[in-house]
From Swiss-Prot:
Substrates-to-products reaction catalysed: urea + 2 H2O + H(+) = hydrogencarbonate + 2 NH4(+)
List of residues that carry N6-carboxylysine: 218
Keyword Cytoplasm: yes
UniProt lineage: Bacteria, Pseudomonadati, Pseudomonadota, Betaproteobacteria, Burkholderiales
MF terms in GO: nickel cation binding; urease activity
Name of the protein: Urease subunit alpha
Length: 568
């Protein structure tokens, strides 16, 4: 017997299907479902009188043959596509994306449900991969709570707490600090990796940090990012298959941007603050976007360009970099970094895929809980100001959505050698997943899974008779407690450190995962974000020209995903 449902009725029951469109929060961005893996009339749904019951949608298969958890009828938004599917999780990893059910009685089932299977209802929800923030100043451990609740599940950077050096630079300096921070990582339900200090002109001070567990090295101008330090740091990285992140020389003391690029010698490097105001060679650090070996990112304080962006930056900069406003030279240093023209160009360079990643710069001018919000605010602003991308039509913004989600998921993972574990929703990867109601997309997740287990969720009064009564707010769940914490999150280290047995020597509880393939990555590997324009910046007007075109846009006076979501 066939029952015909309207699209509205079907979407309300099972979530949107192929050809349906979903608005992301209150933005002008619309995504359209490209494919539905489920089968009409054979959908599985949990609940009283519904499908996932013994002998119906649930089979008799034993635990070894069924997933531990399925997310039913979810919309997946990832760099590879926008699809509707059931998601299977097994042993903390994504096991399959397809059609769940009982293969004994249903056709087309690729994921068998059994008595060992838990169900998370994904109908009407969007699922994304956990975010990856690659620009963390580990100033306060409480950042992790904020980041996790925003949908970020991996944090990479450096620091030792609110030390003056950490306030300004993302470095965990030396073996002793590296060991202590790796031990501290055991206490937090998030994936972590630490960068050592890369500013030295001889190899051994850097090699010993990699051997102690650093996933890479950070060159920062506040420690002296000279051509000699750059060359030495990249040589050590090549020898150890680790990544180098760099904050270049704002004052152009040791050379101009051309000197820095020359010191790279064509070697792969992640350029932090490839942007309009965050630091680095003033005023033309944006030039490096055109280099094949440069993997550029920018940070969220300038995302997107608004009428308030310039005003808040000066005071932030003075605090973060230990500057004194009564000293003329310090004030000039700060003012040289804040340029409306290059900030405006940064918006467009993100939209065209020249800037490959977006991160926070946590508590050091950036906001750790706003990476995802500001990514999508930038996408919205560019849609409004520049219209549809050539790859998109009038019906949807699918390519733009894939481009922007890649900036904080797969591209950071590729850059830092962790894409074999995290960064996308693909079988075999660690099940770090974020579930969103479309109306709250990018702003307030409904639930965050770490390693296949619920880590954080919106939860009501624990003394209530049901889960939903007020006050509803983010609460840590069972993945953050006891021994489950260490089994649902990862600590990333160098291969050298893993081979040296630091897990046993340091007494680490979390599983350690070596980074790999950091040195073979090029801009061409940055998914949907590989454009390499020839950029020039006028030294007097700061106008940015890319491939002969002036890049400029107006500041936004109103943004979506803002005040209406944060009344309480």
């Amino acid at each position: 017997m066939t029952l015909r449902l309207s699209r509205r009725a079907y979407a309300e029951m099972f979530g949107p299907t192929t050809g349906d469109r979903v608005r992301l929060a209150d933005t002008e961005l619309l995504i359209e479902i490209e494919r539905d893996y489920t089968i009409y009339g054979e959908e599985v749904k949990f609940g009283g009188g519904k499908v996932i019951r013994d002998g119906m949608g649930q089979s008799q298969r034993v635990a070894a043959d069924v997933p531990d958890t399925i997310i039913t009828n979810a919309v997946i938004l990832d760099h590879w596509g926008i699809v509707k599917a059931d998601i299977a999780i097994k042993h903390g990893r994504i096991a399959a994306i397809g059609k769940a059910g009982n293969p004994d009685i249903q056709p087309g089932v690729t994921i068998a449900i059994g008595a060992a299977t838990e169900v998370i209802a994904g109908e009407g929800l969007i699922v994304t991969a956990g975010g990856i923030d690659t620009h963390i100043h580990f100033i306060s451990p409480q950042q992790i709570d904020e980041a996790l609740a925003s949908g970020v599940t991996t944090m990479l950077g450096g620091g030792t707490g609110p030390a003056t050096g950490t306030n300004a630079t993302t470095c965990t300096p030396g073996p002793w600090h590296m060991e202590r921070m790796l031990q501290a990582a055991d206490g937090w339900p998030i994936n972590l990796g630490f960068l050592g200090k890369g500013n030295a002109s001889l190899p051994q001070p850097l090699v010993e940090q990699i051997a102690a567990g650093a996933i890479g090295l950070k060159l920062h101008e506040d420690w002296g990012t000279t051509p000699a330090a750059i060359d030495n740091c990249l040589s050590v990285a090549d020898d150890t298959d680790t990544q180098v992140a760099i904050h270049t020389d704002t004052l152009n003391e040791a050379g101009f941007v051309e000197s820095t690029v020359a010191a790279f010698k064509g070697r792969t490097i992640h350029t932090y603050h490839t942007e309009g105001a965050g630091g680095g060679h003033a005023p033309d650090i944006l030039k490096v976007c055109g280099e094949a070996n440069v993997l550029p990112s920018s940070t969220n304080p300038t995302r997107p360009y608004t009428i308030n962006t310039l005003d808040e930056h000066l005071d932030m900069l003075m605090v973060c970099h230990h500057l004194d406003p009564s000293i003329a030279e310090d004030l000039a240093f700060a003012e040289s970094r804040i340029r409306r023209e290059t900030i405006a160009a940064e918006d467009i360079l993100h939209d065209l895929g020249a800037l490959s990643m977006l991160s926070s710069d946590s508590q050091a001018m950036g906001r750790v809980g706003e990476v995802i919000i500001r990514t999508w605010q930038t996408a919205h602003k560019m849609k409004v100001q520049r219209g549809a991308l050539p790859e998109d039509g009038a019906r949807n913004d699918n390519f733009r959505a894939k481009r922007y989600v890649a900036k904080y998921t797969i591209n950071p993972a590729i850059t830092h050698g962790i894409a074999h574990e995290v960064g996308s929703i693909e079988p075999g990867k660690w099940a770090d997943l974020v579930l969103w109601e479309p109306a709250f997309f990018g702003i307030k997740p409904s639930m965050i899974l770490k390693g296949g287990m619920i880590a954080v969720a919106q939860m009501g009064d624990p003394n209530a008779s049901i889960p939903t009564p007020q006050p509803v707010h983010y609460r840590e769940m069972f993945a953050t407690r006891g021994g489950a914490l260490a089994r649902t999150s990862l600590t990333f280290v160098s291969q050298m450190a893993a081979d040296a047995g630091i897990a046993e020597r340091y007494g680490l509880a979390k599983r350690i995962v070596p980074v790999r393939n950091c040195r073979n990555v090029t801009k061409a590997d940055m998914i949907h974000n590989a454009w390499r324009p020839s950029i020039s910046v006028d030294p007097e007007t700061y106008d940015v020209i890319a491939d002969g075109q002036l890049l400029t846009c107006e500041p936004a006076s109103v943004l979506p995903m803002a005040q209406r979501y944060f009344l309480f």
